[in-house]
Amino acid sequence: MTTGNKHLPTTTVTPARVRLFQPTQRPASRAGEWIETSWGKCKVDGRLGQRHADLLEAILYCAERARPEDAGTLKLLIDPARVRQVMSDDRYSLQQLWRLLRELRECTIDVETPTMHIMGGVIESAEHTEELTRRDPLTGGERRLWTVRLGKAWVELMRLDLPLRYDPSPITRLRHGISQAIARHVLTHRGEPQGGWVIDGLIGAVAGDRDGQARRDARRRLREDKAGLVGAGVTVCGDRVHRLRPLVAHSPDGVAHPPDGVAHPPEFSAPLQDPQGLSGP
């Protein structure tokens, strides 16, 4: 089954809303402390940051075949050259991608919302062997393909949560993790509060309470990514953030859109179909 972002979601709305991935490209290892938001809560044993989100979204966006397995995992066929192309402009070696895959495999997530409670792994396994190859037009030789097994917990999250489908390339090219986290958060909303989101409110939504120098640094980094954010469908104007899509205006929520308020409808309103419908030939 050729996906090209047609049959598998790039991600779902909950990870960005419950702060599953730290808003940095250099995440610290977490030891299972709960992070609570009004959309739900999560905890992570391991290391998950925006580069891990980049890779996971790139894998789902580039997956060429998806086959459900009896254990509840989902086996994906991946061309690593396409993943590298989505991830960056020659900034990532295969060894670096493999390190991110290892950290994704080693972590355990626990996500709880009013409609679901899921605990388990993100990736069950990854492998590349000489049995699956493709001609490399640059060298004339063969390059090895990957098979990546999504963990049962992530497969269930895709099945139960609301899917989002977009090209992750513009987000992966942003310089700062805080900008990536804010872009991912904004894209979980179909509409925006009247006047847009206040920057400080979004910083709080993706990074928790920050004040003083930490907040000023976050604002500065977001503005440094202003041009790149436009490619992701997000614009920064003064102290406000807007979506660059047809929007449905919402009434003001007092001050800026409170990061932990009632969720706006997501970009796509139907949950992913049963993974059995994802089988390739």
Each model region followed by its residue ranges:
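Charged, alpha-helix-forming regions
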Residues: 1-281
